[in-house]
Amino acid sequence: MRKTFLLIATLLLIVACKRVPSADWTEGPAEPDGRALHTLVLHDVPQGSRVWFQELFDGKTSVEGPAMHHYQGTSWYVDIPESGTVTLKYYGRPLPRHSWAPEAFILQQKGRPHTPMEVRYHFLEHPKTENDEGSFVSDYELRPADIIPQVSAVKYGNEPMERIDILPSRPEGWYRITIGEEGEPQVESYDADGAFYAQVTLEKLPQPLQPMTIEDWPDYAYRGFMLDVVRDFRTVDEVLEIIDLMASWKLNTLHFHIADDESWCLEIKDFPELTDFGAHHALPDWNLQETSALKPTANGQIGNVTFYTAEEYTRILRYAWDRRIRVISEFDTPGHSRASIKAMQAYERRTGDSSFRLQDPADTSRYWSAQDFTDNVLSVYLPSVYKFYGKVFDEVIRLHKEAGVPLPAIHIGGDEVPEGAWSGRNRHEMKEIFINGMLDLAEARGILLAGWEDIAKGLEPETQERLKNSLYFINVWNTEGIEGFPVVLSPAAYTYLDLAYSDAPEEIGLHWAGYVDERKTFALNSNDYKGDIIGVQAQLWSSQLRSFEDVTYQMLPKGLGVAERGWNGGYLEPFETAFNRFYSIIVAREVPVWEQKGYAFKKR
């Protein structure tokens, strides 16, 4: 008995003393050549194991310790030569902000469960710069009808109504609210959208209601918000909360980015691998093969399910439509297609059916995409590509019909096809084949397409005219060279909410197109652009987001600037005066609501 007790005690002591693998990452200062020497220390890692982590795509040069190997996208790994502590020093770029540091460290051992590793960060002190704080004044004396988006015209008591003389006819979304001395509102509207917007306005007006007449309408028919759920998945309930925010800003289109390199986020019942494989994430096997799931996305999560069932999707559609919001889902093609390519390879392995093949096994193209993938482009010359997307289009059409909501368009992406794709074939001819193939699908089904500006450039005149006839809109960064197409303004420098608020290292986000805050979004001026502008849209890419708190932080308050520019296309007074009023409304009317709901937002 005593020996048994001692044995148990010894085993417990061994377990208690066993060290858990962990990591320390130390930021290095910038050197004269523009690089920085960073240090990564891995503690208590077993010999022969492999440590995976995620870091924004960037070349690295090791100067001490084992090599760091790039896999695909943001994934890197280190093979551990001996047990204990392993130190790596490597040259990379200087760290612009803390969120760019390596993250999601996972220990991989043969025959054992994967182990997430604790990471401790040691960042340099960075002096504050002028960009950390903008000029944000909120001393404008508000009147009762000052809300966001700002109303087109208002009359208090017996004051004359302004701007009505510029309204030649009542546009879609028009409404009028008349509030008498008793505070009882009467609403007139052009359509169901206008009736809903009137209700939103009434909910925002301070109580008790004062006598006034409001006449209001949107300057643009399209007012959108793009949500990327591919790189950092959002639950159904979180999407519904985002829709509520959109509705409160009188936005009317959710551009739902649900298929890209990193994940395929919608159930398609004919192809279970799209979600069984393409919406699950796991470390590659020891031979670096993705045998049962895709590699982790930038957030490093493994074992997670990142898709919407058909029932969940229709729930989102109905919820949005009840708030007068249309949903346009995007399946990014022909680049940004890695998730579907890998998933359909798994489908072919299971079924032996190659008739839906998305990538030619004989293709020897060598390319490097903007997000560091080498295998993410569709073989657009294969008829099987269009057979596959015909099935996808049919299912999306069916789901919208089942939900009883309109299908404005299907967004086909079309951006960032890397140079080197389709080696040995004429790139211009490949684009012609792709656009005409997608148009065949759309025309046969009586639906419209949408896409990023790349799809409209460099086409033959006949293809260009054909595209115009089946196109709802294209998202444009710049309207140059896009003559004759309906466009939705989506310039990165004004509408990409994932870009950091400032260069402060604590901010999350990228900065490749500069910094975007509520001053920048409010400054979007449609008069600076030519062409058939039907609206504006805010974009929220999610490669830097890790939580719903990150989502609302990047939306609030800068998303309001884009919403304002969708409803009111410009400002009729000096910018600082207009922005002072706008920001004063945010502080007085919007911030208390966010605080009451517990949303994370940018505080100043």
Indicate residue ranges for each PLM-predicted region:
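Feature activates predominantly on carbohydrate-active enzymes
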Residues: 122, 126, 180-375, 384, ...
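Active-site neighborhood of glycoside hydrolase catalytic domains
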Residues: 366-473
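Sec-dependent N-terminal signal peptides
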Residues: 4-14
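Flexible, acidic glycine-rich loops studded with aromatic residues
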Residues: 454, 461-472, 477-604
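Acidic, contiguous N-terminal accessory segments
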Residues: 18-33, 81-85, 97-215, 449-461, ...
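Short beta-strand elements of extracellular/lumenal beta-sandwich folds
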Residues: 24-48
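Short acidic, flexible loop segments centered on an aromatic residue
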Residues: 45-68, 104-107
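Intrinsically disordered, low-complexity Pro/Gly/Ser/Thr-rich segments with frequent PxxP/GP/PP motifs
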Residues: 64-95
